[in-house]
Amino acid sequence: MRKFETLLLLSPELSAENREGVVSTFTGIIEREKGVMEEVDNWGMRDLAYPVRKLMRGYYVRLVYQGPAPLVAELERNIRMTDGVFKFVTVKLADEVAGEVA
């Protein structure tokens, strides 16, 4: 299993319940694709350096997880289809991390 980090920039117009729903959807996808969630870090509302979709603020969420490489493709496919996600980036943190086997 590899270790990944995905940083999401969510719309500031999403309610708290909708943000929680979006994050729980993505964590569900990670677990469904045989991944292991390590951390969900809500960075909160922050000012942006430049306007994104004519807005100057965004809500950041950082996901750290382990899983096989195809998991990232499925997660990113779902992120692209989700309304309210402005931008995202996924980074591989480590190769072959010893993870829990279910």
Swiss-Prot record:
<protein>
    <recommendedName>
        <fullName>Small ribosomal subunit protein bS6</fullName>
    </recommendedName>
</protein>
<comment type="function">
    <text>Binds together with bS18 to 16S ribosomal RNA.</text>
</comment>
<dbReference type="InterPro" id="IPR014717">
    <property type="entry name" value="Transl_elong_EF1B/ribsomal_bS6"/>
</dbReference>
<keyword id="KW-0689">Ribosomal protein</keyword>
<keyword id="KW-0699">rRNA-binding</keyword>
<dbReference type="GO" id="GO:0003735">
    <property type="term" value="F:structural constituent of ribosome"/>
</dbReference>
<keyword id="KW-0687">Ribonucleoprotein</keyword>
<dbReference type="InterPro" id="IPR020814">
    <property type="entry name" value="Ribosomal_S6_plastid/chlpt"/>
</dbReference>
<comment type="similarity">
    <text>Belongs to the bacterial ribosomal protein bS6 family.</text>
</comment>
<keyword id="KW-0694">RNA-binding</keyword>
<dbReference type="GO" id="GO:0070181">
    <property type="term" value="F:small ribosomal subunit rRNA binding"/>
</dbReference>
<dbReference type="GO" id="GO:0006412">
    <property type="term" value="P:translation"/>
</dbReference>
<dbReference type="InterPro" id="IPR000529">
    <property type="entry name" value="Ribosomal_bS6"/>
</dbReference>
<dbReference type="Pfam" id="PF01250">
    <property type="entry name" value="Ribosomal_S6"/>
</dbReference>
<dbReference type="InterPro" id="IPR035980">
    <property type="entry name" value="Ribosomal_bS6_sf"/>
</dbReference>
<dbReference type="GO" id="GO:0022627">
    <property type="term" value="C:cytosolic small ribosomal subunit"/>
</dbReference>
